[in-house]
From Swiss-Prot:
Stated name of the protein: Heme response regulator HssR
DNA bind region: 124-222
Top-level taxon in the UniProt lineage: Bacteria
Residues recorded with modification 4-aspartylphosphate: 52
Pfam families: Response_reg, Trans_reg_C
InterPro entries per the UniProt record, alphabetical: CheY-like_superfamily (IPR011006), OmpR/PhoB-type_DNA-bd (IPR001867), Sig_transdc_resp-reg_receiver (IPR001789), WalR-like (IPR039420), WH-like_DNA-bd_sf (IPR036388)
Alphabetic keyword roster: Activator, Cytoplasm, DNA-binding, Phosphoprotein, Transcription, Transcription regulation, Two-component regulatory system, Virulence
SUPFAM superfamilies reported in the protein's UniProt record: CheY-like
Amino acid sequence: MINCLIVDDDKKLLQYVSSHLERESIQTHTFTSGEASLDFLENKNVDIAIVDIMMSGMDGFELCQTLKDDYHIPVIMLTARDALSDKERAFLSGTDDYVTKPFEVKELLFRIKAVLRRYQINADNELQLGNLILNQSYMEITVGSKTMNLPNKEFQLLFLLASNPKHIFTRDDIIGKIWGFDYEGDDRTVDVHIKRLRQRLSKLKSSVSIQTVRGQGYRVDQNV
């Protein structure tokens, strides 16, 4: 099932859009502020986000940029602002599509599906490598009959590596893609997350392992 984040300070619109998407078997998570939606994403993953521009606190432009930079989520702007300058700013913020209010729900559905096709996200949102299955919707990994839920950052890191098997990622690559380039913490946090993931993969008896490439970084490989 596709998971959709909807952020708008208009509660009636949230209910309206959510009810129509749910009828199309799209699970929705609705929030009236960008801050609340980001709190939610600390523990959950979604496939796509629909974002209004005019909101108190964090506006839609800032939220869009955060969703793209930190969570790599496709975004559709849904807003009453139809000025060319607003559209330009939205696309510069990273939005994948721009829909103006009033709108037809059918058109919004077409656009959601079109954006997801571009991202090649399927309804199950799963990735398999060897005997390891990663489910992005639930942030869980499965080997055989055993399933384990992972913390957000650990799952994002493993998903990044597994999506690019044998590609070597430096610490800076990983920090930029998972924590953001403005991250000011210790770069050894990558090593800590890698160590935890190795322990989890070993516990599940996964055929996938995370290899250290001396002087370069990390990659995933399948054990023979």
